[in-house]
A protein has these predicted regions:
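Flexible, solvent-exposed loop segments that connect beta-strands
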Residues: 42-46
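Extracellular/periplasmic, surface-exposed regions of secreted and cell-surface proteins
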Residues: 1-37, 47-227
Length: 227
């Protein structure tokens, strides 16, 4: 098995409090399996050679712009917006061959027979000696998102967030989803009456939130239906 992971990030401060960042990451893995079962382990006295290769690739690009501003001594504002793109690809190739001439032949040369017949109860069936399977799947996800954070004296906090995702796993008429959220908090440990009377309390906070979440299909072509 081999796995390679890389990440690249670049940031630039346009002005005080305003930053732009872009990042690119990739995750690549390849797994191979070769397996041989000798004939004496099979009820039909057939050996079996199996070979499989699986390849997975994930690429993620994120682009963010963020702004932070302190207004006077009491107000703090933070803004963030971004776009991301994720691409996933899975590839599989595998197969098996049975009944090699000798248990010392671990792989399946092209000269091996492709099939045989078996008769049982007056019925003759064809048994395949060779089988091959391949698969390749792709899916992508595009996201637009933003967030506004405000707090007053680090005591009263408000967060508004919004995300819009588009996934290739859904049908063309239902590809996009919208996911808003809102949260409010109170850091009561920052209140003077708490500090004066409860010196042993280092931090205390109450937070309430609401949001909408979602997920996309694990199978990339489920929305296409059965042909």
């Amino acid at each position: 098995n081999v796995r390679l992971r890389t990440n690249f990030r670049l940031g630039y401060e346009v002005m005080e409090g305003l930053n732009i960042t872009t990042s690119l990451s990739a995750d690549y893995s390849i797994a191979r399996r070769n397996y041989f079962q000798p004939s004496y382990l099979d009820k039909d006295n057939w050996s079996q050679s199996v070979g499989e290769t699986g390849i997975n690739l994930m690429v993620l690009n994120e682009n963010l712009i963020a702004y932070k501003k302190k207004i006077g001594e009491e107000h703090n504002l933070s803004l963030m917006a971004g776009i991301s793109y994720q691409y996933d690809q899975m590839e599989y190739n595998g197969g098996y061959a049975k009944n090699s001439p000798s248990d010392k032949i671990y792989y399946a040369p092209g000269s091996l027979p492709t099939h045989t017949t078996q008769t049982s109860g007056g019925t003759t069936n064809t048994v395949l000696f060779k089988h091959y399977q391949s698969d390749m799947q792709e899916k992508s996800l595009v996201s637009y998102f933003g967030r506004i954070e405000y707090n007053y004296r680090e005591r009263y906090l408000l967060t508004l967030a919004y995300r819009r995702d588009g996934s290739s796993t859904f049908g063309a008429g239902n590809r996009w989803g919208n996911f808003p959220s809102v949260a409010a908090g109170w850091s009561f440990s920052e209140e003077p009456f708490i500090k004066d009377n409860l010196g042993w309390l280092s931090f205390g906070k109450i937070r309430a939130s609401w949001g909408r979440s979602g997920m996309h299909f694990d199978y990339p072509y489920l929305a296409l239906g059965v042909v």
